[in-house]
Regions:
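Conserved active-site and cofactor/substrate-binding residues in soluble primary-metabolism enzymes
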Residues: 6-14, 44, 56, 60, ...
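Glycine-rich, flexible N-terminal cofactor/catalytic loop recognition
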Residues: 35-67
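Glycine-rich oxoanion-binding loops at beta->alpha junctions
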Residues: 57, 64-98
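Acidic beta-strand-to-loop metal/phosphate-binding motif
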Residues: 97-105
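Fold-independent oxyanion-binding glycine-rich loops
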Residues: 23, 52-54, 72-73, 104-105
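N-terminal amphipathic/basic leader segments beginning at the initiator methionine
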Residues: 1-48
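Aromatic-enriched hydrophobic runs in primary sequence
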Residues: 11-13, 20, 51, 59-64, ...
Length: 105
C-alpha cells in the first residue's frame, strides 16, 4: 500500500493547507493558526459552536464546520487531541457577544 504524504510529521498541516486552498470561501485558518479551522465571518445572533479532535484517518471534524453548522473546529495530530492553543485560537476566531459552546467528545 502506498502512502500519499510527504512526511508524517507534516501530514496534518499539509492536508489543512490543501483544504484551505481548495475551498477558500468556505474555510480559513482562525487567528493565523492552521489548526484553528473556521468558517469565515463571525456568526451573528447565535452562540458560536466549536468542536474538534484528533485528525485520525479522515478529517471528520472538518465536515461539521459550515453555515448552519459548527463555526470552528480545533484540529489535533493523528489520534491526538487538539492543543489548548488551537482550541483558544479557534475560540477567539469565532467568539461573539453571545458566547461559545464547546462540543468535544
Amino acid at each position: 500500500m502506498k502512502k500519499c504524504m510527504n512526511n508524517s510529521d507534516d501530514f496534518v498541516d499539509e492536508s489543512l493547507k490543501g483544504i484551505y486552498k481548495a475551498y477558500p470561501s468556505f474555510y480559513e485558518a482562525g487567528c493565523d493558526d492552521i489548526r484553528a479551522f473556521v468558517h469565515p465571518g463571525k456568526a451573528k445572533g447565535k452562540v458560536s459552536i466549536v468542536t474538534g479532535g484528533g485528525y485520525g484517518h479522515i478529517p471528520v471534524f472538518l465536515g461539521y464546520v459550515g453555515e448552519g453548522l459548527c463555526d470552528g473546529a480545533a484540529v489535533g495530530n493523528v489520534f491526538t487531541s487538539p492543543s489548548s492553543e488551537a482550541i483558544l485560537n479557534t475560540t477567539r476566531a469565532v467568539e461573539n457577544e453571545n458566547g461559545v459552546l464547546y462540543l468535544f467528545g
